[in-house]
C-alpha cells in the first residue's frame, strides 16, 4: 500500500541540518520520526477515502526554537520551526518564523495534503453486481506555500509583503452522458493559484489600521479520455434497436482567471468606553474557459432526432464576479454594568457570464436508417446574477452583580436579488428568474451565571423571513442552547451542553422541515500534572424533509433524511519517570438514512533512555462498518509504528 511521498526526505534532511547548525547554541530542539506499517482488511479504497494513513517513514513532530537577547549580532532574535505529518501521512506541514524585534518578521507556512475518494456506492450503477468503487473518484495531492514579510513591525508604519502558491493535481474518474448512454472517463486534473500581496499596517496610538492589496491568478486544466473497457457504456439496452457504443473520446478544457483583492481594517479607541471596528474587503474576478471535445461511436440523440457516429464540439465562456463586503461595529460602555454593541454589515455580489458552444454531428442517419446531412448546433447563453444585502444589529449586555450576565440582540437584514438566466438553461417553466426581495429579522437573548464552582449558560435565537428565494432558504428558524459546568474538586470537572435547532419553510413545492437535537457530557479528571483522564458522551438526532424534483420525469417527491448518532470518547494520559503512556478509544454509532459504526483505538508509549534520546511505540486501529453495504462498506485497519525521539 506504500505510496511515495518525496517531501519526507527533503523535510527530514532540512530539519537535521537546521538542528545540527543550531544545537551548539541556546536552542530548544525535538524530533520524533520513524516507520509505520498497516494491516488492512476489507475495503482499502474506503479506508483511504476516510483516514488514508500509509506505510512508510513519517515525521510525527519536529520543533526548533532559538531565542536571542536583543542586540545580538546575528540576523534574528527569534527563530521557531515546527513540522508534523511529513511522510506516510495524508496531511503534513512545516511552519517557520524568524525575525528581529521592531526590524522584521518573516513567516513561512507549507502544507501538503492528499485528497482521495473512491466510495463504493457513489455514482455506481454496477454495485448490485459486486463491482466497486463507484465511477466518480479522485486521487490528488495539494501543495501550498505561504510567505509573509513584515518590515519594522510594531512601529508607526509597517510595510507588508506576501506570496501564496497553491497547486492541486492528480488523476480521477468521472462519467459523461452522451448518445443516450453514460460512459466512464479518465481525468487528469491540474489546478494552480498564485497570489501576490502588499500593503501597510499603521500603529497610531489608540488606532490601528491596515491596507492590503493582492493580485490572484488561477489556472486549471482538465484532460478527459475514454476509460479502457468503457466502450459499451453503463446501459446495455439498445436505443431504437441500435446498440449504443463509444469508440473514442477526448476533451481538453482550460480555465484561467485573475482577481485583484483589497482588504482594509481599522480599529480604535475613540474615547474612554467607546471603541470602533471597521473592515472592507473586495475581490473582482474575471475568468475565461475554453474547451475542445471530439468523440466517435454508434450513438443516438433525441435532441436532433438522429443516430450519429461522431461529434466535434468547441466551447468558450467568460465570467466576471464582483464581490465586496463592509462591516462597522461600535462598542460603547454605558457605565460599569452595561455595554452596547451596534453593527452595520453590507455585502454585494454580482456574477455576469456568457457562453458559446458549437457542436457538429457527423455520420448522421435518421431513426429509420436513412442517411442524413451533418447537423450543426450553436448555443449562445448570457446569464446575470446580483445580490445585495444590508444588515443592522444591536446587542445590549448587562452585568447584574458579579455572577450574572444577561444579553439581548436584535438584527434585521434586507436582501435584493436579481437573477436573469438564459432561456436555454430553463428546464422547468416558471420561477427561474426575476427580481426578488427578502427580509430577515432576528431576536436573540442569553444569560450566564458564574459561581466559584458552578457555571450555567442559556441562549435563544429566532430568525423569521418574509419569503424564500432559494430552495435552501428558510422562513423560520429557532435555536436553544444550554450549558453547565461544575468543578467538584480542583482535579475533577463535569460539564454538559445541549442544543435544539428547528427550521421550516411551509411553502408548497418546498415543504422543508428540519429538527436537530444534540447533547454531550464531559468528565475531566486531572489529579496531578502527570495524569489526565477524560470521558465524553454525545448524542445527535436530526430529521430533515424537503420536496425534490426527480430529474428523469421532473416529478416532485418528498425526500427524507434521518440520523441518530451516539458517540463515546475516552482519553487517558499518564507519565511516570521516563515513561509516557497515552490511551484513546472512541466509538460512533449512527442509524437512519445512512447507518454506520466507527470505532477507533490508540495506544502510544514513549520512553526516554536519557535526556536526549528515546523511542516511541504506537498501536492504532480503525474499524468501520456500514449497515447497507455489508462487507464492501467495511474495513479493519491496524497501524503500528516505531519512532526515534531526539531532544535537548
Residue ranges of model-derived segments:
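Sec/Tat signal peptide C-region and signal peptidase I cleavage site
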Residues: 20-24
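Gram-negative and organellar
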Residues: 26-29, 35-648
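Bacterial N-terminal signal peptides that target proteins for export
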Residues: 1-10
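Bacterial N-terminal signal peptides
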Residues: 9-19
Amino acid at each position: 500500500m506504500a505510496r511515495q511521498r518525496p517531501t519526507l526526505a527533503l523535510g527530514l534532511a532540512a530539519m537535521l541540518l537546521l538542528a545540527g547548525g543550531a544545537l551548539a547554541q541556546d536552542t530548544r530542539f525535538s524530533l520524533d520520526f520513524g516507520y509505520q506499517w498497516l494491516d488492512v482488511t476489507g475495503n482499502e479504497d474506503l479506508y483511504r477515502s476516510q483516514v488514508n494513513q500509509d506505510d512508510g517513514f513519517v515525521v510525527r513532530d519536529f520543533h526548533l526554537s532559538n531565542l536571542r537577547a536583543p542586540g545580538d549580532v546575528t540576523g534574528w532574535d527569534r527563530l521557531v520551526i515546527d513540522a508534523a505529518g511529513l511522510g506516510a501521512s495524508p496531511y503534513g506541514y512545516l511552519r517557520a518564523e524568524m525575525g528581529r524585534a521592531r526590524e522584521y518578521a518573516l513567516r513561512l507556512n507549507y502544507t501538503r495534503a492528499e485528497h482521495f475518494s473512491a466510495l463504493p456506492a457513489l455514482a455506481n450503477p454496477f454495485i448490485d453486481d459486486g463491482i466497486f468503487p463507484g465511477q466518480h473518484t479522485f486521487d490528488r495531492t495539494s501543495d501550498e506555500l505561504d510567505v509573509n514579510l513584515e518590515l519594522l513591525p510594531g512601529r508607526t508604519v509597517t510595510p507588508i509583503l506576501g506570496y501564496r502558491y497553491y497547486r492541486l493535481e492528480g488523476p480521477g474518474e468521472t462519467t459523461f452522458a452522451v448518445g443516450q448512454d453514460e460512459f466512464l472517463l479518465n481525468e487528469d486534473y491540474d489546478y494552480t493559484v498564485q497570489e501576490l500581496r502588499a500593503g501597510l499596517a499603521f500603529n497610531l496610538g489608540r488606532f490601528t489600521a491596515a491596507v492590503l492589496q493582492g493580485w490572484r491568478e488561477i489556472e486549471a486544466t482538465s484532460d478527459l479520455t475514454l476509460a479502457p473497457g468503457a466502450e459499451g457504456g453503463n446501459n446495455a439496452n439498445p436505443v431504437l434497436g441500435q446498440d449504443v457504443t463509444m469508440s473514442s473520446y477526448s476533451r481538453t478544457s482550460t480555465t484561467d482567471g485573475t482577481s485583484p483583492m483589497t482588504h482594509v481594517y481599522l480599529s480604535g479607541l475613540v474615547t474612554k468606553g467607546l471603541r470602533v471596528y471597521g473592515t472592507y474587503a473586495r475581490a473582482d474576478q474575471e475568468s475565461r474557459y475554453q474547451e475542445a471535445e471530439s468523440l466517435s461511436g454508434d450513438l443516438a440523440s433525441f435532441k436532433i432526432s438522429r443516430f450519429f457516429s461522431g461529434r466535434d464540439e468547441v466551447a468558450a465562456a467568460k465570467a466576471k464576479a464582483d464581490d465586496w463586503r463592509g462591516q462597522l461595529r461600535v462598542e460603547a460602555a454605558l457605565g460599569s454594568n452595561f455595554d452596547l454593541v451596534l453593527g452595520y454589515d453590507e455585502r454585494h455580489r454580482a456574477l455576469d457570464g456568457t457562453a458559446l458552444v458549437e457542436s457538429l454531428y457527423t455520420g448522421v442517419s435518421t431513426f429509420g436508417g436513412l442517411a442524413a446531412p451533418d447537423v450543426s448546433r450553436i448555443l449562445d447563453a448570457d446569464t446575470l446574477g446580483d445580490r445585495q444585502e444590508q444588515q443592522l444589529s444591536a446587542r445590549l449586555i448587562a452585568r447584574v452583580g458579579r455572577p450574572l450576565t444577561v444579553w439581548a440582540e436584535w438584527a434585521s437584514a434586507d436582501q435584493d436579488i436579481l437573477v436573469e438566466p438564459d432561456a436555454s438553461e430553463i428546464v422547468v417553466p416558471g420561477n427561474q428568474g426575476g427580481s426578488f426581495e427578502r427580509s430577515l429579522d432576528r431576536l436573540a437573548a442569553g444569560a450566564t451565571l458564574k459561581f466559584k464552582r458552578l457555571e450555567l449558560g442559556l441562549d435563544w435565537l429566532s430568525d423569521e423571513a418574509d419569503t424564500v428565494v432559494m430552495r435552501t432558504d428558510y422562513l423560520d428558524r429557532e435555536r436553544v442552547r444550554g450549558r453547565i459546568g461544575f468543578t467538584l474538586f480542583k482535579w475533577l470537572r463535569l460539564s454538559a451542553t445541549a442544543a435544539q435547532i428547528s427550521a421550516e419553510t411551509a411553502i408548497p413545492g418546498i415543504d422543508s422541515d428540519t429538527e436537530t437535537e444534540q447533547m454531550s457530557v464531559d468528565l475531566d479528571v486531572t489529579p496531578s500534572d502527570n495524569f489526565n483522564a477524560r470521558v465524553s458522551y454525545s448524542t445527535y438526532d436530526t430529521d430533515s424533509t424537503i420536496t425534490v424534483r426527480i430529474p428523469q420525469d421532473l416529478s416532485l417527491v418528498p425526500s427524507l433524511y434521518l440520523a441518530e448518532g451516539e458517540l463515546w470518547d475516552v482519553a487517558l494520559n499518564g507519565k511516570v519517570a521516563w515513561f509516557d503512556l497515552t490511551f484513546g478509544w472512541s466509538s460512533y454509532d449512527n442509524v437512519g438514512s445512512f447507518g454506520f459504526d466507527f470505532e477507533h483505538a490508540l495506544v502510544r508509549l514513549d520512553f526516554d533512555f536519557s535526556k536526549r534520546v528515546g523511542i516511541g511505540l504506537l498501536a492504532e486501529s480503525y474499524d468501520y462498518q456500514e449497515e447497507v453495504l455489508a462487507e464492501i462498506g467495511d474495513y479493519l485497519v491496524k497501524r503500528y509504528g516505531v519512532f526515534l525521539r531526539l531532544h535537548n
